[in-house]
């Protein structure tokens, strides 16, 4: 079923995140997470004819939401290649970049993609359906220790070793091919009152590994730091502690580790100044309208 932009994904913190860009009407902007196009449309509504917006999405499904506007270019690519694409288009600097790091509702609600444990689906989880290992490949091929590390680091699950052991045992009986197969192998390890939360963390961990999300985020933020001109804004919405920590560290220190370097005179060398010292979160009305926004945090920084 073809979805409208409105049903593909509801934009989170729409006004707040675009306001955070401090739009210059003739500027060059990037939305690295196009999805349903909500944030891109809002940015375009504030631009003049001589401005331009480049929007990225690695999922070809998002192309159905492309905006017919001469000031708009859709790039069907992972945002980790931001710098390469800007070089391709002859863009040397940016006035602002927006990222909404949440998974589109389209992905959670599409039964064929394997992102949600609500459906019995092929265990896929690839944002880009044309490339890379599927979640099933990882679950069936990775060593037990590697699986345990994924569930511990990306899902923050304390029983990660037991989960990995259960999966390895299950796959010796038959390949784990669907979300139902996957859940059947690990469900006995979860307490009933925490089952949904822990299963969500497990699916999150596997999705992050499938799509190399942490590495891609670090590469994109590094490129953004280089491309943003002085006064340019970085507006990023995060949804879990792992990605939020990386964004926070880059904005405060200029690197994912949060290590502030000093110049010859002992002065801190940081590329950004924070626009909002406290994170911005959706108000009660937005959370009620869009429950998937509840964990969202918006951070905004300005290039020095």
Q: Predicted regions: what is each one?
A:
Residues 1-304:
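S-adenosyl-L-methionine-dependent methyltransferase catalytic core, i.e., the SAM/SAH-binding region
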């Amino acid at each position: 079923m073809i979805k409208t932009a409105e049903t593909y994904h509801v934009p989170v913190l729409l006004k707040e995140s675009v306001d955070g860009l401090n739009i210059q009407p003739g500027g060059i902007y990037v939305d690295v997470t196009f999805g349903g196009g909500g944030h891109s449309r809002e940015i375009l509504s504030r631009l003049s004819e001589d401005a331009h917006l480049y929007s990225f999405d690695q999922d070809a499904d998002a192309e159905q939401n492309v905006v017919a506007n001469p000031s708009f270019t859709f790039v069907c690519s992972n945002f980790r290649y931001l710098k390469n694409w800007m070089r391709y288009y002859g863009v040397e600097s940016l006035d602002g970049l927006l990222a909404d790091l949440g998974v589109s509702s389209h992905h959670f609600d599409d039964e064929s993609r394997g992102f949600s444990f609500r459906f019995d689906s092929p265990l896929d989880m690839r944002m880009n359906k044309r490339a890379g290992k599927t979640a099933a490949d990882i679950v069936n091929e990775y060593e037990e220790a590697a699986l345990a590390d994924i569930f511990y680091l990306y899902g923050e699950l304390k029983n990660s070793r037991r989960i990995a052991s259960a999966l390895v045992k299950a796959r010796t009986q038959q390949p784990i091919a669907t979300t139902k197969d996957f859940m059947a192998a690990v469900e006995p390890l979860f307490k009933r009152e925490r089952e949904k939360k822990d299963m969500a963390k497990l699916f999150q961990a596997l999705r992050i590994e499938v799509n190399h999300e942490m590495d891609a985020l670090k590469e994109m933020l590094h490129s953004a730091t280089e491309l943003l001109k002085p006064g340019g804004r970085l507006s990023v919405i995060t949804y879990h502690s792992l990605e939020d920590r990386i964004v926070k560290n880059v904005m405060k220190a200029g690197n994912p580790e949060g290590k502030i370097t000093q110049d010859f005179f002992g002065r801190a060398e940081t590329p950004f100044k924070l626009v909002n010292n406290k994170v911005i979160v959706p108000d009660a009305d937005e959370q009620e309208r869009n429950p998937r926004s509840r964990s969202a945090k918006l951070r905004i920084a300005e290039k020095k």
